[in-house]
Amino acid sequence: MDVNPTLLFLKVPAQNAISTTFPYTGDPPYSHGTGTGYTMDTVNRTHQYSEKGKWTTNTETGAPQLNPIDGPLPEDNEPSGYAQTDCVLEAMAFLEESHPGIFENSCLETMEVVQQTRVDRLTQGRQTYDWTLNRNQPAATALANTIEVFRSNGLTANESGRLIDFLKDVMESMDKEEMEITTHFQRKRRVRDNMTKKMVTQRTIGKKKQRVNKRSYLIRALTLNTMTKDAERGKLKRRAIATPGMQIRGFVYFVETLARSICEKLEQSGLPVGGNEKKAKLANVVRKMMTNSQDTELSFTITGDNTKWNENQNPRMFLAMITYITKNQPEWFRNVLSIAPIMFSNKMARLGKGYMFESKSMKLRTQIPAEMLASIDLKYFNESTRKKIEKIRPLLIDGTASLSPGMMMGMFNMLSTVLGVSILNLGQKRYTKTTYWWDGLQSSDDFALIVNAPNHEGIQAGVDRFYRTCKLVGINMSKKKSYINRTGTFEFTSFFYRYGFVANFSMELPSFGVSGINESADMSIGVTVIKNNMINNDLGPATAQMALQLFIKDYRYTYRCHRGDTQIQTRRSFELKKLWEQTRSKAGLLVSDGGPNLYNIRNLHIPEVCLKWELMDEDYQGRLCNPLNPFVSHKEIESVNNAVVMPAHGPAKSMEYDAVATTHSWIPKRNRSILNTSQRGILEDEQMYQKCCNLFEKFFPSSSYRRPVGISSMVEAMVSRARIDARIDFESGRIKKEEFAEIMKTCSTIEELRRQK
């Protein structure tokens, strides 16, 4: 069913069609090769914006550091990072004055969180810089490695599982003269294969102990690893993003908890809410400005863009903000919160993989690791790279670059939003003390500014004052990229406002289609995406019906499950035709078994198995939903699963869908090639960890990782739980006497083995 796209626009007002001009169809661009160049760009740019600051040397690591705080006031429109401490503190004081008690209350909320958070909070998140292996790892593995190293170095505060205790260990680790770590390495040997008698390379993974002195350890603890940000649409150049190690993460988490708590209480903050809630919040601010600008006042809105938000922010400024926000709070609390900005003032950026050189004539390739950039002869590089390396050389230590100013992407989104809102807050008439006044919205580096004044000159004066006030705290509004309109039309965080928010449907386009998890999940996710867009994004009934038909078509092509009575030949059609012919009630077959599609826009909320259950042949039901079916490795079945869908911008978001487990809910097996690499040792650790956690969850189904309290180990807890459960089951007649005896015997054996160990 091919559709002529112009038909979709016959009755669409022009402003609703803006979304079709977005670069959101097709595959997003990915980066290939090394991110070293992008990282050097970031480091060099950040230093350039703060170049008039003071240089100092870190006494512990020897890293040169640039401090632009309270530097010269800007004389031109170039972006700069010279924030003035007294201005930031004053903005904080005024924010508190307009919102009495806001800081106090947020501190109390955060204190509670600090005392309750468990260390497993740090296992969330994807890739994390693992300082023990000097590369990225899944968060859970990186945390396990860190705790293991701490333990072998006599740091044991984290045994109790509170995050705050783990952070105590981090602080102590920085005072140690040396740390002993375990690293993985590969050995290659040539051996003769007995079967084929050929020589083969055998790889073995070894673990070796290595001592790291205080300076090297500090450098690693303060290192942010960098990667290239992938899948960014609408940009010509790629850019670098950072991933911090486990030492920094916990501290950042607490600072962001505090800032989030403040943002929730600020009407101008676009974080931490999202979706419809965010739209409602924004619409309120706009309504307020428009009602107040009756006939006498003009009201204009700037769709704002800031130049290099992260690179002009400064951790020292954040330290000043935290010091102000937590005044009158207990000393321990102030200390915990001030560590993150202090660590960021001393951060090091890891330059990534380095450069790859190829010689076309000699068919040679060689990797120049980042560590060599400090000493290598520059004649091998092209001019632009040569300039970058020359500029960054004074900052290099062991393949990392000292980067004191700037924030790196996405680390303190909430706290930087608080700073932005504090400037918006100064637009009230009682602060401007003149005829113009402003308000607006702030979400991380994105902002919309609404200025009201009696005439155009007043609007201009208001914008100028806002611009200059921002400069004082290191925020640089871009005059080239911001534009101004009569209030009622603007864009903020990709929401388009035109007398109300227009659905920007194109942003959802990438999440339509077949996800590729398995037949069962894909069907469920596909219809849920359509349902959600009907609810949230003005997807009309006709378009939704069309989207559904296109989805079913796409799904059948993906899984080669065309209807049993079709003429299309695929490698599955022989089996599916046979099934079709044997089935009495053909309407009961799932689409993935060659059945018809029974979905329409009225029943998208019902999982397909439930929709067709009454129509199924009995033996088909038996095969489809049989947990003993040998062809299915079953996940634990939960009623709701989470899928990761890719909206067009922003992070992948998690979306819930109904999960009915059938023989179609298979789990693909892990690719074998990883087993021959140096990752193998890590993979085995990870599987071990996974198995233990799964086993533990079997015993404590409601645990969700709240470890048993007290001093018992996980094994002891599981044994005692097994005994209690067995006794209850035996007494209620659920298990026989023999089974009960066997369980008791097994428990005793386990305890005996532990004692011998």
UniProtKB/Swiss-Prot annotation:
<dbReference type="InterPro" id="IPR007099">
    <property type="entry name" value="RNA-dir_pol_NSvirus"/>
</dbReference>
<feature type="short sequence motif" description="Nuclear localization signal">
    <location>
        <begin position="187"/>
        <end position="195"/>
    </location>
</feature>
<keyword id="KW-0945">Host-virus interaction</keyword>
<keyword id="KW-0547">Nucleotide-binding</keyword>
<comment type="subunit">
    <text>Influenza RNA polymerase is composed of three subunits: PB1, PB2 and PA. Interacts (via N-terminus) with PA (via C-terminus). Interacts (via C-terminus) with PB2 (via N-terminus); this interaction is essential for transcription initiation.</text>
</comment>
<dbReference type="GO" id="GO:0042025">
    <property type="term" value="C:host cell nucleus"/>
</dbReference>
<keyword id="KW-0597">Phosphoprotein</keyword>
<comment type="function">
    <text>RNA-dependent RNA polymerase which is responsible for replication and transcription of virus RNA segments. The transcription of viral mRNAs occurs by a unique mechanism called cap-snatching. 5' methylated caps of cellular mRNAs are cleaved after 10-13 nucleotides by PA. In turn, these short capped RNAs are used as primers by PB1 for transcription of viral mRNAs. During virus replication, PB1 initiates RNA synthesis and copy vRNA into complementary RNA (cRNA) which in turn serves as a template for the production of more vRNAs.</text>
</comment>
<dbReference type="GO" id="GO:0039523">
    <property type="term" value="P:symbiont-mediated suppression of host mRNA transcription via inhibition of RNA polymerase II activity"/>
</dbReference>
<feature type="region of interest" description="Disordered">
    <location>
        <begin position="50"/>
        <end position="82"/>
    </location>
</feature>
<keyword id="KW-1104">Inhibition of host RNA polymerase II by virus</keyword>
<keyword id="KW-1262">Eukaryotic host gene expression shutoff by virus</keyword>
<dbReference type="GO" id="GO:0039694">
    <property type="term" value="P:viral RNA genome replication"/>
</dbReference>
<keyword id="KW-0696">RNA-directed RNA polymerase</keyword>
<dbReference type="InterPro" id="IPR001407">
    <property type="entry name" value="RNA_pol_PB1_influenza"/>
</dbReference>
<protein>
    <recommendedName>
        <fullName>RNA-directed RNA polymerase catalytic subunit</fullName>
        <ecNumber>2.7.7.48</ecNumber>
    </recommendedName>
</protein>
<keyword id="KW-1191">Eukaryotic host transcription shutoff by virus</keyword>
<feature type="region of interest" description="Promoter-binding site">
    <location>
        <begin position="249"/>
        <end position="256"/>
    </location>
</feature>
<dbReference type="GO" id="GO:0039657">
    <property type="term" value="P:symbiont-mediated suppression of host gene expression"/>
</dbReference>
<keyword id="KW-1048">Host nucleus</keyword>
<dbReference type="GO" id="GO:0000166">
    <property type="term" value="F:nucleotide binding"/>
</dbReference>
<keyword id="KW-0693">Viral RNA replication</keyword>
<keyword id="KW-1035">Host cytoplasm</keyword>
<dbReference type="GO" id="GO:0006351">
    <property type="term" value="P:DNA-templated transcription"/>
</dbReference>
<feature type="short sequence motif" description="Nuclear localization signal">
    <location>
        <begin position="203"/>
        <end position="216"/>
    </location>
</feature>
<keyword id="KW-0548">Nucleotidyltransferase</keyword>
<keyword id="KW-0808">Transferase</keyword>
<dbReference type="GO" id="GO:0019083">
    <property type="term" value="P:viral transcription"/>
</dbReference>
<feature type="domain" description="RdRp catalytic">
    <location>
        <begin position="286"/>
        <end position="483"/>
    </location>
</feature>
<keyword id="KW-1190">Host gene expression shutoff by virus</keyword>
<keyword id="KW-1195">Viral transcription</keyword>
<dbReference type="GO" id="GO:0030430">
    <property type="term" value="C:host cell cytoplasm"/>
</dbReference>
<feature type="compositionally biased region" description="Polar residues">
    <location>
        <begin position="55"/>
        <end position="64"/>
    </location>
</feature>
<comment type="similarity">
    <text>Belongs to the influenza viruses polymerase PB1 family.</text>
</comment>
<dbReference type="Pfam" id="PF00602">
    <property type="entry name" value="Flu_PB1"/>
</dbReference>
<dbReference type="GO" id="GO:0003968">
    <property type="term" value="F:RNA-directed RNA polymerase activity"/>
</dbReference>
<dbReference type="GO" id="GO:0003723">
    <property type="term" value="F:RNA binding"/>
</dbReference>
